[in-house]
Regions:
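Compositionally biased, low-complexity segments enriched in small residues
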Residues: 1-4, 19
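Sec-dependent N-terminal signal peptides
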Residues: 3-14
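Scaffold/interface architecture of coatomer-like assemblies
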Residues: 15-311
């Protein structure tokens, strides 16, 4: 076991026991990609030769390529428990429990966080759908449920509201950074951030540095529509687009159960693409990525860039 402690904005975050993890080869850039056709259907059967990778406009040689069903999956589920979600939480519990039961395999892990006025870890890494379901049972409006082992992930914000950006940052930096395989953050929220100390770009940067993909489930109670200012839809879209994820919208014709089924299908239809950058300078700078499919009718969904972290 190892202890992980991070300091954010002058606030010392609580150290927690973490599972020992393997380190990734820092010279290899790994990209998760999904491919869709013009009808938005997933394309799961492409080969390495069907892809082109550009870094800052320069072609790169793909060294590693695999279907994502072969790699372990680490999921962080973040559930909005602010007042605007009060009438949706029971539905979220049931749908998320079913999702974990269907998507997790023996080598996969997941953790569960809630966020409202603060962020809280309800269930640490586990491969047990039963433990995750128990954690879902502890969801409570406005800040989650207290006293759940191993305790709260300290929030950055002390203001009242919905600390969406802070929660994503904490999930990426405290939980996912350093893990191997596929790393996914699934956020269930109406997208309206209120009270975070960090901004949207900082949340995106944290996810990119952790090689994590953000999938946003836009779930809004119609009774609260417009009550908290502008829609959070643009924020959800930006965070998902920049990290290679997708926004799923729950509405009368598209249930949360259906959304989780589509998300599961996408996770099982991904490609992992790896290359060694021709630019060997590790200056901490941002490198733009452009992943293309040979078939012009296909659209590749992948992160827009990465940070060349200094050794």
């Amino acid at each position: 076991m190892r202890i992980l402690t991070i300091l954010i904005l002058g606030t010392l975050l609580l150290a927690q026991d973490q599972p020992t993890t393997l380190k990734v080869d820092v010279d290899v850039v790994s990209i998760l990609a999904s491919v869709r056709d013009k009808k938005n259907a997933l394309i799961p059967s492409l080969q390495k030769e069907d892809f082109t990778v550009l870094e800052d406009g320069k072609p790169q040689t793909i060294k590693y390529f695999t279907k994502e069903t072969d790699l372990p999956l680490t999921i962080g589920l973040l559930v909005d428990v602010s007042r605007s979600q009060e009438n949706l939480i029971d539905i979220e519990r049931r749908a998320a429990s079913q999702f974990f039961s269907q998507v997790l395999r023996k080598k996969d892990l997941a953790f569960l966080m809630s966020f409202g006025e603060e962020s809280e870890l309800l269930q640490d890494y586990t491969g047990s759908p039963r433990l995750l379901t128990d954690g879902l049972g502890q969801l409570r409006v406005s800040g989650g449920a207290g006293g759940i082992h191993p305790g709260p992930v300290p929030t950055i914000s002390q203001q009242r509201g919905t600390v969406l950006f802070d929660a994503i940052y904490l999930a990426a930096t405290e939980k996912l950074k350093g893990e191997v395989g596929r790393k996914v953050i699934v956020v269930i929220t109406d997208g309206v951030d209120q009270g975070s100390k960090l901004n949207r770009n900082q949340a995106i940067e944290a996810a990119q540095k952790a090689d994590a993909v953000i999938y946003s489930i836009d779930y809004e109670d119609p009774r609260y529509h417009g009550m908290f200012g502008p829609s959070g839809d643009p924020d959800l879209k930006k965070m998902s687009d920049e990290t290679g994820g997708h926004v799923y919208k729950v509405d009368r014709s598209h249930s949360l159960e259906q959304v989780f089924k589509e998300l599961q299908d996408e996770m099982r239809s991904q490609y992992s693409i790896g290359y060694t950058p021709s630019n060997e300078v590790k200056d901490g700078g941002y490198r733009k990525l452009d992943i293309r499919a040979a078939n012009k009718d296909y659209k590749v969904q992948a992160r827009k860039g990465y940070y060349a972290i200094k050794p």
